[in-house]
């Protein structure tokens, strides 16, 4: 996405999925990424940096778990640069820890932010402090056999407001992956970051679907979600992870 910097000019958003050594423990992810990698990235002149980490604070299971035994990424690194063509130094830094790295040039829609809904107050914590609650981060490709514009319209005009109405989201960052930065990357069109008030709002179905203990409402909301999902992606290739959000350098200005 093109963002206007505070002092003029525009920047682009890139997102990198980072796979660490298989067997890396959750309590090792934070020190590695926040203390080892993030300072180097910040020194490289980035305009903004956010890390979503599968760390010791993100222990609850995903609502849509990956197949048993699959090696899933442990970090999603979002960064803002002047020009994606000069991303080489960034990738060199990330490759210090990554056994696999997949980057995408994305267009971001900040559909909702902290303080816009009743589920959270406006952000009041500084850069470098973990965001409260928990994230779910989903990836999916365009559903095979669909027209792109119709698919995109359904995602943006129907799925986004529907899920906003029946789920307790604090923040919803909708990233449209317009192109992979390496041809060997997975085919993705969407990287969706959703923040929730607490882990219990993800693990408790009645809280996750705002049914207030009513099983009929729960069933109706789950059915609505599944019907929308079937028009968006293949459940066999869609992935969802629970992660911690770390805003390390907020992009200023607009």
PLM feature segments, named:
Residues 2-254:
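Macromolecular interaction modules
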